[in-house]
Amino acid sequence: MLGLLRKIVGDPAQKQLKKNEKIVDQVEALADEMKQLSDEQLKNKTTEFKAKLEEGASLNDIVVPALAVAREAAGRVLNEYPYRVQLLGALALHQGNIAEMKTGEGKTLVGTIAVYVQALEGKGVHIVTVNNYLARRDLENYGRIFQFLGLTVGLNENGLTREEKQKAYAADVTYSTNNELGFDYLRDNMVLYKEQMVQRPLHFALIDEVDSILIDEARTPLIISGSVERKTKLYGQANTFVRVLKRDADYTYDEKTKSVQLTDEGVNKAERAFNIDNLYDQKHVQLNHHINQSLKAHVAMHRDADYVVEDGEVVIVDQFTGRLMKGRRYSDGLHQALEAKEGLEVQRESITLASITFQNYFRMYQKLAGMTGTAKTEEEEFRNIYGMDVMVIPTNKPVAREDRPDLIYKTMQGKFNAVVNEIAELHKTGRPVLVGTVNVETSEVVSKMLTRKRIPHHVLNAKNHEREAEIIEKAGHKGAVTIATNMAGRGTDIKLGPGVKELGGLHVLGTERHESRRIDNQLRGRAGRQGDVGSSQFYLSMEDELMRRFGSDNMKAMMEKLGMEDDQPIESSLVSRAVETAQKRVEGNNFDARKQVLQFDDVMREQREIIYRQRMEVLEADNLKTIVENMMKATVERVVQTHCPESLVQEEWDLAAVATYINGQLLSENGISEKELKGKEQEELIELITEKVLAAYHAKEAEVSSEQMREFEKVIMLRTVDRKWMNHIDQMDQLRQGIHLRAYGQNDPLREYRFEGFNMFEAMIAEIEEEVSMYVMKAQVQQNLKREEVAEGKAVRPSANGQEDKKAKRKPVRKAENIGRNDPCICGSGKKYKNCCGANR
């Protein structure tokens, strides 16, 4: 449908690109004029542009001369004079879009000249990269252009002091990673003094490798968490039980969704093993959860593919980059289940103090732009969620890479044999080869096979990313064979060594199709940079995960009927189309999942914005007296309306309950009597009680200085808001975990989540008002009161891997007894534990 509409009305991004061609003509027309200027005159142009903006001009009014100035500065500082196509890319970024530029086309330079224009407003511009190495490298190389033109530059990275971060954010241009920006935002909304904040209002962000950050990591939440004490015995017991279960008989596993669930027989075994009547009883929720997570750890999570064990710890492997994500933990107890599975020490779970996804963080910027080599396949998502068009920028030189059709083998062994033979043949000629794998396991299989053939090679995967830049740099040299997991080394160009062009350039060999076409395109794009020669080809088998998930059984049966050998490939455009169709289906599923996550996240986003805005008002306010008085009035109104509703006659009102609450929470023991309340209308009751409460409040204030009282109120309010918000995050998270079950009752889970979430938020606000009122009236005003954090938090990145953003939940801790050696075994066999599953313990 979208394609048909485009044929009729045209692609808006391409229309804009044609308009931009005319603007580029104007920029190029100023080239000679800029060359005549001295360095000082060129620098003074920045002051001139800023003055025009202060007088009311817009960035669009000055974009042509500003780009011309930045272009000339790049030529003088770096000896890199931007091409015409790079100016087209810079304009796309200036307009808040995504510039899709092929590998080696100079995206970083494009971003630099576009950012110069945005930075002229003086509101702070963030250049976002995926890791600290790239942020530092770009600042050292390209940051000099900004400094040459009189702008300030800062680097924001992990481990800086508060003062260093404030200085970095105060600069005109700040280089940072996406993680650090998100964590700083969360930390800023947990500070106890406004002076402790580091970020300015979010103005403009330019995201490098935008698809990686806004698509691949969109569902991964950034979390500030605090540890919580929890017994870990149950993880071990669930792990011991799950080990004896049999597939299909006791549980089922769906490879498409990676979901595992117990069968009726499995449930019966669990009930016998743990000596309970009903596993699905409310009091066994925690046990059920532990069994399910342990089952997932054993069946759906694979060592050296989803995670590795290093130094006695389970370390997650990023499914998109193949890198180890140290410090990041699977949430919702899955990490603990993996620790139990691997026989490691089970660590404590944590409580969420603050959380945000990249989707919601980056949508808060006034203006957003991005660069990548592959975004067109996700154009719909960028437009619908972030309001950005993908503009495909032409290459400076035509692409000379040959993309060969896929080769499909019957078995995985046949495929790997063919891969190694092809590498051996190319290696004899001296032509460099880059082998792309989808996980650590595959890279090590290929590596072992090459070692047996005595072919020297480098392996670039999650286990040795420290040498990444060095390995990638040499990957284009004569005779180099490099095995890389997915897009390890992204952001670093592979340049051809001497004599390689004559051999045909770099050959990229993919050992498996990724579920996303974009990731495959990134791998292909490693060859043929800036018009270089090169080639690419994918080797597939009917046993590959993508093929298995989307019905390769018929094709495999056909190959067997034809009597095809394991090492005999099919090279057919029909098969390639089938693979692409499968990829489109997976991409569609993933987009739908991200869209659904965003719809649920939007509920929390709205609530978070309200809380953070009100918290900021508390921090900035010198006098909270009016706010406190309003909270007291609201509390009184609520108590009266609850116990004395107008729907009942006065004789049925519970005046005793009103008096008990008011005396216990807001006044002294005999502050108000039931007798005083009798015979009054609801409004009169509210007026009388409010008058008494406010009189007591003013009397308390008179006992201390006004300054002491105001600080006392601020401390109480910050502590209460932070504690209640922390609990609310947890409750909303628990609500979200089970909300999908409402669909069985013909209710829309999203609508139910919104409705119940709103009610819970309203209840939290009421609790804040009541608690603040109580503490202000009942607590003793202390001298030199110090503001303290409710809980000490640390930044963590839970993985989205099949968990979306399920954060660690706090549930009631129930006692789980140790299994004695002579007790019945938990597997339900009827034998003693010591003679069954505990025999080797």
Swiss-Prot record:
Positions of the UniProt region annotated as Disordered: 788-822
Cellular compartments per GO CC: cell envelope Sec protein transport complex; cytosol; plasma membrane
Pfam families recorded: P-loop_SecA (PF21090), SEC-C (PF02810), SecA_DEAD (PF07517), SecA_PP_bind (PF01043), SecA_SW (PF07516)
EC number(s) stated in the UniProt entry for this protein: 7.4.2.8
Record bears the keyword Transcription: no
Keywords linked to the UniProt accession: ATP-binding, Cell membrane, Cytoplasm, Membrane, Metal-binding, Nucleotide-binding, Protein transport, Translocase, Translocation, Transport, Zinc
Subcellular location(s) of the protein: Cell membrane; Cytoplasm
Record: residues binding ATP: Q86, G104, E105, G106, K107, T108, D493
GO biological process: intracellular protein transmembrane transport; protein import; protein targeting; protein transport by the Sec complex
Domain of life: Bacteria
Known cofactor(s): Zn(2+)
Binding-site residues for Zn(2+), renumbered to this chain: C825, C827, C836, C837
General function of this protein: Part of the Sec protein translocase complex. Interacts with the SecYEG preprotein conducting channel. Has a central role in coupling the hydrolysis of ATP to the transfer of proteins into and across the cell membrane, serving as an ATP-driven molecular motor driving the stepwise translocation of polypeptide chains across the membrane.
Alphabetized PANTHER family for the sequence: CHLOROPLAST PROTEIN-TRANSPORTING ATPASE (PTHR30612:SF0), SECA INNER MEMBRANE COMPONENT OF SEC PROTEIN SECRETION SYSTEM (PTHR30612)
Quaternary context: Monomer and homodimer. Part of the essential Sec protein translocation apparatus which comprises SecA, SecYEG and auxiliary proteins SecDF. Other proteins may also be involved.
Family: Belongs to the SecA family.
Name of the molecule in the record: Protein translocase subunit SecA
Organism: Shouchella clausii (strain KSM-K16) (Alkalihalobacillus clausii)
Gene name of the encoded protein: secA
